[in-house]
Amino acid sequence: MYWIGYDIGSSSIKAALIYEDDGRVLAVEQFPKKEMPIVSEQIGWAEQDPELWWQHVCTLTKTLIEDNRISKNDIKGIGISYQMHGLVVVGKDLKPLRPSIIWCDSRAVTIGENLFHSAGTEKCVEHVLNSPGNFTLSKLIWIKENEPEIYNRIYKFMLPGDFIALKLSGECVTTPSGLSEGIMWDFKNDSLANWLLEDAGIDPSLVSDIKPSFSEQGFVNKQGASESGLPEGIPIMYRAGDQPNNALSLNVMEPGEIAATGGTSGVVYAISGQKNTNEHTRINSFAHTNHKADQTRIGKLLCINGTGIQYSWIKNELTSELSYNQMNQAAESVPVGSDGLQILPFGNGAERMLENCNKGSRIHNLNFNVHKSAHIFRAALEGIAFSFVYGMEILKNDGVDITSIKAGNDNLFRAEVFAKTIATLTQSKINIVETTGAVGAARAAAYAAGKFANMGEATATDKIQLTHEPDATVEPYQEAYNAWKKTLQEYLKN
């Protein structure tokens, strides 16, 4: 018997099959092989066709079943992970009324700022833990203000994962975690933030039915089965946005645990047992997958735009003949602190953790008689690592007591200089685990159905690929970090 998981990204869709008995991975597939198109009719806009996501889900499902020579009737349930903060609106026929406004669309920034003040900044922080920002609710208000003929035809609005569940089941359902990422969940009252919707002029009846992240959220109907190739009647047991789901995939579920990502941009996702926040201008707080009224589990999300993109820029523009492994090895030949060379890696747009500062990247203390290319490689890796540590200090100030750090098997966390710098400065070992969001979603669905006692059991077959231990000698790392942070503070003042 198997469980299937989907990860609905903006670049591609992934699907995975896991064995029901122990959570082992049977297969993982991705489609399309080239990135899905994102339509940008104006600067700052980003839209995708939700039906295209569904078409790729159907293609992947049939491919998984055929290539692995299994019976579709052996698939027992479904889990869904999806790109966060997107907006899909459907009419009474349950078809999209317009393209989805996805996560990287920035058209609603001003709307969110205005709502934050009209609804009351203190009330927003106390109840929804965030400013409405540029998230799902603000995007819906944009439609109301700019496309009233479409808004007036809306039957339900939803997140990308909710739409895929709708296509499978014919039911409009969402989750508290999903509503929290759209800044519509009242943590203080453990309910939909009706007061915020009313202030925004949004009819609460447009919200889909609300069910827990781990629960029966619908069953594959006849049409969903016919189009996808799945058996009719199997349950959708789980859904969550990609960052909470990434943490779940790494079995990051309890206060103090951190899931880190070091891709083009960097993410630190920390679990907290507290509902309050002191840092709402620099981090976002959402309901984690296992959050309940009587069990506070808040995912505190800190993003760093200028991470892997900086390292890839150095590779492509300065040393294209070297591989990343060769760059990493060269960096290891340079002492901690890069002989004084410092790089601030903030060259990929406004950085929320720096309160939306957008001054660009900086190289400091470059000495033509001392510094070689290897120094640049190390200073780049250290600068990114220092940014992560700086972000973790913000999380600590927001009540997170770090107990463990886990990361997926991506390029930056395979770089010894990068990972050991973080491990040493936080005094936390970093475990690198090979997994994917689609696998995590499949396991979470099986867990929700009672096939596993907890997510630790569901992920027990995952092997730790690599462990980065703190260096026994902390002083040079701390000195280098303190010097870098002083440079950062001067950079922010000027």
Question: Language-model features: where?
Answer:
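Signature tryptophan residues that serve as conserved aromatic anchors
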Residues: 45, 53-54, 103, 142, ...
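Short beta-strand-loop/turn "lid" adjacent to the catalytic site in phosphate-handling enzymes
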Residues: 44, 66-103, 129-134, 165-186, ...
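Extracytoplasmic ligand-binding clamshell segments of periplasmic binding protein
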Residues: 206, 212, 243
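Active-site core segments that coordinate phosphate-bearing ligands/cofactors
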Residues: 3-5, 17, 109, 116-130, ...
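Residues that line or immediately flank small-molecule/substrate-binding pockets and catalytic motifs
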Residues: 33, 82, 104, 214, ...
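N-terminal glycine/serine-rich phosphate-binding loop of ATP-dependent small-molecule kinases
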Residues: 1-98, 110, 153, 208, ...
